[in-house]
Amino acid sequence: DIAVLTLGRVSGEGCDRRVEDFLLKENELALIKQVSAAYRAAGKKLVVVLNICSPVETASWKGLADAVVCAFQPGQEVGNCITDILTGKVNPSGKLPMTFAVKYGDAPSDANFPFDYEFKMPSFAMGTGMNFKSEKKEEKPKEPEKNVDFTNYEEGIYVGYRYFDTFGKEVSYPFGHGLSYTAFDYAVE
């Protein structure tokens, strides 16, 4: 028997995550600690499923989980997919397409992605493709606002794992990290 605990974050095009979404909330961390303690005391395992689109803080709690699975917002079939992986019906064979930093601010791109503005889209319109333009005429066009209307990419060649590898920065999970249930060997002939 195992406990499967799922944590999620919502974001998408035009609705990036807030800076504080990188961190686990106090109640999420408390839940991980409580479930881990209870299951380990009974000789059972805890699997944490991350239903996310970009990294969250894992360094402080990953030792409490026996496995961490990144689902990366898989949609309505997530339950079936995770069940198939955890029961060994399918081989997960996934590798991380990004680096999980130890803390927010460790990656140079963090400075360019703060969702620090008020999102005004009506909740009923999310995902509908409906365009809500005001009928009000502006006398002067609005100046584009950084991190709302555009984003500067200032990392140069040090995008993603290149920064962490080049500067030897400690990470929680490196780019390409991942396991599968398959055993294999590489051989050069």
Predicted regions located by residue number:
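Secreted, periplasmic, or luminal enzymes acting at the cell surface/secretory milieu
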Residues: 42, 51-189
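Hydrophobic helix-and-loop "lid/oligomerization" segment in the mid-to-C-terminal part
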Residues: 1-39, 49-63
